Curated annotation (Swiss-Prot):
The keyword Transmembrane applies. It comes from Candida dubliniensis (strain CD36 / ATCC MYA-646 / CBS 7987 / NCPF 3949 / NRRL Y-17841) (Yeast). GO terms for biological process: sterol biosynthetic process. Belongs to the sterol desaturase family. Its cofactor is Fe cation. The gene is ERG3. GO terms for cellular component: endoplasmic reticulum membrane. PANTHER family: STEROL DESATURASE. This is Delta(7)-sterol 5(6)-desaturase. Residues 214-337 form the Fatty acid hydroxylase domain.
């Protein structure tokens, strides 16, 4: 994310922050007392576990006893342990890395490394990029890929597409806000993101291996999170809004409850905190994830691959609720006994209208049976055939 942020700072934000939040300007003068008070806070520090005796240390290493715990030193110890994972050379904003310094770089009291500026910048960038990617990819999928016969499906909702768009556009900013702490960790050197491609980092071979590792790790994480989201109490509170869409359009891809979307994005953010990942590949993979999310909601069934959890598999999930929780592969569904093979009828092209209606009727019958078990008798959806 530091690459994107520095591009935006260089071409736009440095000047904007200099104009809106200049040093010694009205906003700065108003906030100076609060800034001064914050800077004078004495945060606890602890340099080394072994340098403290039993009178002042967290715990005596020679005489371990819970009664020897000194609560006053716990925050300092935890802070020192956290700091030991920080790569200070990766802290964003201390010095430009990719572009020369602009004439405005030091003219705002909100410097590039200021956490409040970072939060605001990240929120603006990620929200706008999220909206842009969502609308562009979903629109292209709708025009060129989406099977518009779905509009006639008995479980298509009244005004469904506009409802999907409304849900997605309102959810994206909240999802961004919830994920900003992960971006801040990356910007402050608490991740394994790197930019140099050389022998010490494994070269291009390591980068190629990072792709399947990222897919497998996130596929596993999302599978278990998705199953958790189908626990009855969690489903009712968080995941049900996404299952409002029994049959989907590409615009359903991001139509989540924002907290649901946040939980399902966690594996993507955890991966670079745990494993090495090239910074450019990181951005490409995040873009790919958004493409994939749209693709599996586009209602176009190209392949019945036994390994890839494609559009057909995800259609089964929306129709029948309790199957195909995976994101990219069918591996964890097979291991977790939740895999359901898509019906062959999904892959028949140019089906006769009467046969299609018969298939949809059977889908609806099975769906209603399972929906009743998952959601209860009352269904608050408004279908086109009502």
């Amino acid at each position: 994310m530091d690459i994107v942020l520095e591009i935006c700072d260089y071409y736009l934000f440095d000047k904007v922050y200099a104009d809106v939040f200049p040093k010694d300007g009205p906003v700065h003068e108003y906030l100076k007392p609060a800034i001064q008070s914050f800077s004078e806070i004495n945060f606890p520090k602890l340099q080394n576990w072994d340098s403290f005796d039993t009178n002042s240390t967290l715990i005596s290493s020679n005489n371990f006893n819970i009664s020897n715990v000194n609560p006053a030193t716990i925050p300092g110890y935890l802070l020192s342990k956290i700091a030991s994972y920080q790569d200070k050379s990766e802290i964003y904003g201390l010095a430009p890395k990719f572009f020369p310094a602009t004439e405005f770089i030091d003219t705002s009291f909100l410097s590039r490394s200021n956490i409040f500026r970072e939060v605001l910048s990240l929120f603006i960038i990620t929200t706008l990029f999220g909206w842009l990617l969502y609308f562009i990819v979903a629109y292209l999928s709708y025009v060129f890929v989406f099977d518009k016969k779905i509009f006639n499906h008995p479980r298509y909702l009244k005004n469904q597409m506009s409802l999907e768009i409304k849900r997605a556009t309102s959810a994206i900013p909240v999802m961004v806000l919830l994920t900003i702490p992960f971006f801040l960790l990356e910007l402050h050197g608490y991740s394994f993101l790197y930019e140099e491609i050389n022998e010490s980092t494994g070269g291009y071979k390591a980068i190629l291996w990072q792709i399947p590792k990222f897919i497998l790790f996130t596929d596993c994480g999302i599978y278990f999170l998705h199953r958790w989201l189908h626990w009855p109490s969690v489903y009712k509170a968080l995941h049900k809004p996404h299952h409002k869409w029994i049959v989907c359009t590409p615009f359903a891809s991001h139509a989540f409850h924002p907290v649901d979307g946040f939980f399902q994005s966690l594996p993507y953010h955890l991966y670079p905190l745990l494993f090495p990942l090239h910074k450019v590949l990181y951005l490409l993979l995040f873009t790919f994830v958004n493409f994939w999310t749209v693709m599996i909601h586009d209602g176009s069934y190209w392949s019945n691959d036994p390994v890839v959890n494609g559009t057909a598999c995800h259609t089964v999930h929306h129709l029948y609720f309790n199957y195909n929780y995976g994101q990219f592969t069918t591996l964890w569904d097979r291991l977790g006994n939740s895999y359901r093979r898509p019906d062959d009828s999904l892959f028949v092209k140019d089906q006769k209208k009467e046969e299609e209606k018969k298939i949809w009727k059977e889908q609806t019958r099975q769906m209603e049976e399972i929906r009743g078990e998952v959601e209860g008798k009352v269904d608050d959806r408004e279908y086109i055939d009502q």
